[in-house]
Amino acid sequence: MDSLNEQARIEVAIIGGGVIGLACAFHLAQNGHEVVIFDPAPGRGASYGNAGGITPGWVAPTATMATLRALPRMLADPLSQLVIRPAYLPRLVPWLWQFALSARAHRVEAISKALASIAMSSVQAWTAFAEDAGVSHLIRQQGLLYVYAKSQTRTGAQPAHALRRKRGVLLQDVDQAWLQKFVPTLAPEYRYGVFAPEAAHVVDPGALCDGLLNATESLGGRLRRLAVTDVALEPTGVRLHTAKGSWLAERIVLACGAHSKELAAQLGARVPLDVERGYHAMLPTPGLELPTQLLDGEGKYALTSMRDGLRLAGTVELGGLKLAPNYARAQQLLTHAKRLLPDLDLSNPAYWMGFRPSLPDGLPVIGFAPDSKRAVLAFGHAHIGMTLAPVTANIVADLLAGRQSSFDIQPFSPSRYA
């Protein structure tokens, strides 16, 4: 971090230092822009504690009729995959209504196509991006393996897998013998699997964010460890207000994830952004290493071998930004994981909770703010911020340069809920 007085004019301010903001900052610095990142703790929010997946197959929307049918059962169990905190339910009703509208068949198809348009190239995008940023050593392309113990669970997952195949995702159905050979530590009751060989994962998301920040600073980028509390359009730029003063930026990229809603509204974008609270349990001495990232179809969570242990990550808790964490949701992951991997050492777990920025349709917001082309919005990536960071950075760079993007970004318009 370096000093930056209030009189200093900023060319491009990046509001938010998660993986999306850092990727945008690095790519813009590569393109010759002078960038300043504003974030009190870069790389230590949702980008730090996620499962690390780079998942080109994330093209099956969460909002489906099957999800809606399962909601009553899930909501009756405080430790189910999806939970709504009762105190937050009244505020969530408009979001849930939009979620239900997104579950209609024609919307599921459209949303799936939109996700595929930006997710399918994510591994290739990361390969080039990571090489430039010097973080290639943190990425492993070892695939993603969905595993199921019950035939009815496997059957219930088939519509999502069929949609992935329809979009062009490479999937291989595998049997119990294949599973036992590939993952010998897997419990024998897991008899069914689907392998996505093209997927990748990050072995240390926090270190990857640090690497992007260092690469940006090596290109002249700067960091202010401050939260932006307000923004205001002025004739010659966008005014950023913080607890320690204000700065004028010629242009800004709003990429502060779950904290973007109010700032976006100040730029004319009124979007139903809310928060999916996600949990992880980190096992420092698991006693085993996985040959691929696993997704347990029974417990609906991911298991990722990382540099500092095994990470169990998942669950969705709708409860906003202010309610206290319920770490029983992280602790239950240990029970699920022991059933999946009987030899797993559960000693000394560390628990974490973070905020996924989520729109009801499952699509991020990427595009110019309605009130000004001085502001580009890039937030709401939910479960796939890590996956989509380089692609998002490429789109943002194109927008600020006035170039025609190779991606159709209309589905991600900040005005789509207007």
Regions found by a protein language model. Give the residues of each.
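A conserved short coil-to-beta-strand element within the FAD-binding core of flavoproteins
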Residues: V174-F182, R224-V238
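Beta1/beta-strand and adjacent pyrophosphate-binding region of the FAD-binding site
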Residues: E6-G18
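C-terminal catalytic lobe of FAD-dependent flavoproteins
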Residues: L171, P205, E298, R339-A418
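Rossmann-like flavin
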Residues: V93-N214
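N-terminal Rossmann-fold NAD(P) dinucleotide-binding loop
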Residues: G21-L22
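Glycine-rich FAD pyrophosphate-binding loop
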Residues: Q30-G49
